[in-house]
């Protein structure tokens, strides 16, 4: 009798959980955000600018995804570049590709229903922690070890693809080169969530991360948990890389974390200003790149990266020309008060 009541209770509890899961749509907040906030803004811009592409739902998702990536990319990338870890983002992107293929391979071989994005997150995070563990024992990041991890991850992915006679090759191109059409509501929801997590954690741990980035020895002496903050940074990098992979592609996703930061470093006067300028540069590149991608039917990732490189070239030119322009300005008549008095005139 007791067993019967226990089974009924267990069944009822399971039914309640199932009903709650079916009743509460995990994507409902994202759909509400797109329909009630992003949609009306895009519709207004469509009316003002006369560009119908802003009214298409898939373009609204693409723009929102690009904007999110352009925020979290430099937010993490600035710390990476100043720690001379820029290659880590590329390494994690290629191992994340192996994670995608692992998920597709298991679904094909074992008839499972795993999300390839979940397996990509798992593989990227595990790889990030393993790389950090290797660094702790080696004492420094080495291009050789990162290159081996990068090529090894990509090699595993290619082996699994060919092991099924190309049966899982469908959709791989979208991960390699990025695609606007494949950015779903679920992708946007994940990006929004990761943006909040990454932004929140970087804000809360900004000073310790800054301390560890520039002087890990002094941070250790100040009794900061240097190992914890270093591992936190590589895990955040893995989250950013995988979440951006769908629109940027595996091959180009690292550029979102590196190129805008390099451009900002040319003109910034401090770390905080460097982060701000990198985000602004990345936002410009993302919005312009998505627009060019739709207008000319070219890859979104490639468009964004080429635009970002263009911004870098401009900042490089500004940095090189600024001293010459200042010298020319000093030679202009009436530049100094002494020059004005010597001429016997006044500045109008």
Predicted feature residues:
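Transmembrane helix-bundle core of multi-pass membrane transporters
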Residues: 17-19, 44, 48-49, 146, ...
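Small-residue-rich segments of transmembrane alpha-helices in multi-pass membrane proteins
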Residues: 94-104, 148-160, 182, 226-230, ...
């Amino acid at each position: 009798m007791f067993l019967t009541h226990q089974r009924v209770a267990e069944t009822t509890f399971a039914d309640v959980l199932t009903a709650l899961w079916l009743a509460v749509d995990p994507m409902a907040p994202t759909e509400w955000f797109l329909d009630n906030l992003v949609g009306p803004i895009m519709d207004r811009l469509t009316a003002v600018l006369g560009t119908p592409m802003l009214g298409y739902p898939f373009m609204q998702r693409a723009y929102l995804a690009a904007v999110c990536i352009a925020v979290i990319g430099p937010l993490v990338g600035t710390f990476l570049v100043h720690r001379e870890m820029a290659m880590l983002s590329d390494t994690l992107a290629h191992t994340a590709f192996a994670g995608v293929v692992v998920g597709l391979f298991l679904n094909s071989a074992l008839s499972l229903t795993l999300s390839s994005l979940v397996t990509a997150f798992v593989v990227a995070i595990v790889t990030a922690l393993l790389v950090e563990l290797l660094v702790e024992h080696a004492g420094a990041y080495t291009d050789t070890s990162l290159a081996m991890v990068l090529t090894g991850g990509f090699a595993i992915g290619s082996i699994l693809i060919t092991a099924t006679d190309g049966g899982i090759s469908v959709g791989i191109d979208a991960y390699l080169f990025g695609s606007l059409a494949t950015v779903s509501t679920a992708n946007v929801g994940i990006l929004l969530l990761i943006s909040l997590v990454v932004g929140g954690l970087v804000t809360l741990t900004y000073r310790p991360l800054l301390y560890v980035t520039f002087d890990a020895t002094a941070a250790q002496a100040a009794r900061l948990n240097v190992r914890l903050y270093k591992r936190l940074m590589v895990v955040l990098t893995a989250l950013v890389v995988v979440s951006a992979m769908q629109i940027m592609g595996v091959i180009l996703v690292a550029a979102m974390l590196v190129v805008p930061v390099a451009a900002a470093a040319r003109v910034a006067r401090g770390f905080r200003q460097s982060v701000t300028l990198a985000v602004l540069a990345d936002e410009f590149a993302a919005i312009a790149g998505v627009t060019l991608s739709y207008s000319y039917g070219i890859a979104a990732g490639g468009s964004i990266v080429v635009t970002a490189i263009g911004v870098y070239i401009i900042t490089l030119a500004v940095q090189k020309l600024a001293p010459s322009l200042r010298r020319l300005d000093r030679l202009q008549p009436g530049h100094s008060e002494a020059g004005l008095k010597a001429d016997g005139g006044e500045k109008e």
